[in-house]
Structures are given as C-alpha cells and as structure tokens.
Amino acid sequence: PNPACKDYSEEYQALYHEHMAKMLEERPWIWSSHVWNMFDFGCAARDEGGVAGRNNKGLVTLDRKVKKDSYYIYQAYWNKQPMVHLCGKRYAQRAGETTEIRVYSNQPSVTLFLNGEKVEELSAEKVFVFTVALKDGFNILTAQAGEVKDTMTLEKVEKEPEIYVLPEVNERAE
C-alpha cells in the first residue's frame, strides 16, 4: 500500500520520522530535540489506525515488545555503532511485479541480497531505497553494511491481505 497521512501505518510513521530526523540533521543550530512519543499509550478519546483507545504514534508498541521502523531512523542518525535495519518486516506479504525495500543505516553504503544473490549496492545518507522483483513464494532479503546486517522474509502473493488496508471510519463502526 501507499502510506498516507491519517492511515496510521508503520510505513507512514517511518516516512514522517525520516523527514523529521533529516530536518534536525540539517539544522545544526537546534541544540536539543526529543521525539513524541517513545511508546504507544492508552488514550480513551483516540480511535486511530483501527484501534480504539490508543495513541499509536510511539516508536515502540504499547507492550514495549516491538521497535517500529521509525525507531531505527534515529539510530541511523544518532548511533555511533555501525547499524543496518530493513524496514517493512511486518508488511510481509506483498503483491506486484516489484516492491520497495527501505533500509536505514549509518554506514555510507548498503548491499541488498535476495535469496543469497546480490541485488544492488547503494550509497546514500541514512535511507537506502531499493526496488526489488520478488520471486514467487517466500523470499529472504539481507541488507549488509560492512560487518552489520539485517534479514527479513517476505512472501510474494497475488493479493495483499485486507488487514493491510485501514477501513473507513464508518466501516469500523458497523
């Protein structure tokens, strides 16, 4: 799906934080910053992203178990230890001829592998975007930057699950 404002997807949140982290980096006169919110939290008045009673804008889930992709963009900007992170692990079933693979890293270049075969090596600043043609069935993707790497499994499907599409507000109320 194409992430858009008010869809409350992890993908849209990551795009938003990519923009914010880059803005902070480009403005050296900003001597302090913080992120609102570190964790999702309960909020009775909220009905967002198909979940009632939760503000889901945190970088980590309400139960503190899952670091969302947006968490890792700040690591790419602020962490001194080499790191690489493949985005979209929870968007695991994908349809279409090609799919976009986003990688966050604080290294100058990242190499992407599909089922053990090199796809491409890119140089970028923090956000690396690859276009990949998945094979039918399950695919193992590995992003590597020097000694650090991250791996995920995606499945190429004919049609993406309905759960990937946020119902309209009036549809959720039925």
Q: What feature does the model see in each segment?
A:
Residues 152-173:
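Low-complexity, Pro/Ser/Thr- and charge-rich linker/hinge segments at domain boundaries
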